[in-house]
Amino acid sequence: MEGHVKRPMNAFMVWSRGERHKLAQQNPSMQNTEISKQLGCRWKSLTEAEKRPFFQEAQRLKTLHREKYPNYKYQPHRRAKVSQRSGILQPRVASTKLYNLLQWDRNPHAITYRQDWSRAAHLYSKNQQSFYLQPVDIPTGHPQQQQQQQFHNHHQQKQQFHDHHQQQQQQQFHDHHQQKQQFHDHQQQQQQFHDHHHHQQQQQFHDHQQQQQQLHNHHHQQQQQFHDYPQQQQQFHDHPQQKQQFHDRPQQQQQFHDHHQQQQQFHDHHHQQQQQQFHDQQLTYLLTADITGEHTPYQEHLSKALWLAVS
């Protein structure tokens, strides 16, 4: 039909272009219908990895087709009129009739044989007297034989549809299993992240407590030295040889006082840094760890710890 825009090839048609030619060369006497069955069985036996390049090529052809024909809509051809005298298809619609007989699914992954029907129409145009729909095994004899052949063709189409539906079910089950495995892996990664972050928080809190204890012990030692100073004064009065040390004591007191102030400033600054780091880490965890948005008991525990540290 002139002016008719062909549908883009699906993955099976892309794959079968070369395979059909090879199979026809290896088996010159094999009929078109048998070749199509063999190709369908081989296509089903391919793995998803082996099919993926052909699906990608089919998607590319579909994109080019959409760009070339932006207003294209699929319109099935009208069924061909069969001559009452001979049962011969008219030349102009021969390929359309053959195509519609086995075009049982519009799914892009379904098996279609459009190229075969175009080839059959070409053969018919070369020899109109001998073309009797042999590629699809449509008999032109007794009506009972025609009904039997139609029932056989319908049964084949039903079997193909069942096989295709079963393949889709298996693929959906495989995809669901993969998604379930990915979700399980994600849950494990999230749990590992929680455990690692919790361990880091505990270690940092323990280190902070140790630093606080060391600072407290040092401050206590300084206070003890300050309380011992009156006793040292009494020893000075009892021992004249320590007179020079007594004169230097006010300067030492000032140094001790300055040192005590520096220690206090260091303690305050270090404590403020620890609180800020703890607060920043807690905010980072609350924003990134729990992607589901739920408030976990562990987050409540960290929030209470943060409040105690700040207060």
Curated annotation (Swiss-Prot):
Residues 5-73 bind DNA. InterPro entries: HMG_box_dom, HMG_box_dom_sf, SRY-related_HMG-box_TF-like. It comes from the Eukaryota. SMART domains: HMG. GO terms for molecular function: calmodulin binding; DNA-binding transcription activator activity, RNA polymerase II-specific; RNA polymerase II cis-regulatory region sequence-specific DNA binding. Residues 142-151, 222-235 have a biased composition (Low complexity). PROSITE patterns: HMG_BOX_2. CDD domains: HMG-box_SoxA_SoxB_SoxG. Keywords: Acetylation, Activator, Calmodulin-binding, Cytoplasm, Differentiation, DNA-binding, Nucleus, Repeat, Sexual differentiation, Transcription, Transcription regulation. It is found in: Nucleus speckle; Cytoplasm; Nucleus. Residues 135-279 are annotated as: Disordered. Pfam families: HMG_box (PF00505). Residues 173-187, 236-261 have a biased composition (Basic and acidic residues). The keyword Amino-acid biosynthesis does not apply. GO terms for biological process: cell differentiation; positive regulation of gene expression; sex differentiation. Its main location: nucleus. Acetylation of Lys-81 contributes to its nuclear localization and enhances its interaction with KPNB1. Deacetylated by HDAC3. GO terms for cellular component: cytoplasm; nuclear speck. Belongs to the SRY family. Transcriptional regulator that controls a genetic switch in male development. It is necessary and sufficient for initiating male sex determination by directing the development of supporting cell precursors (pre-Sertoli cells) as Sertoli rather than granulosa cells. Involved in different aspects of gene regulation including promoter activation or repression. Binds to the DNA consensus sequence 5'-[AT]AACAA[AT]-3'. SRY HMG box recognizes DNA by partial intercalation in the minor groove and promotes DNA bending. Also involved in pre-mRNA splicing. PANTHER family: SEX-DETERMINING REGION Y PROTEIN, SOX TRANSCRIPTION FACTOR. Interacts with CALM, EP300, HDAC3, KPNB1, ZNF208 isoform KRAB-O, PARP1, SLC9A3R2 and WT1. The interaction with EP300 modulates its DNA-binding activity. The interaction with KPNB1 is sensitive to dissociation by Ran in the GTP-bound form. Interaction with PARP1 impaired its DNA-binding activity. The Gln- and His-rich domain may mediate protein-protein interactions. This is Sex-determining region Y protein. It comes from Mus spicilegus.
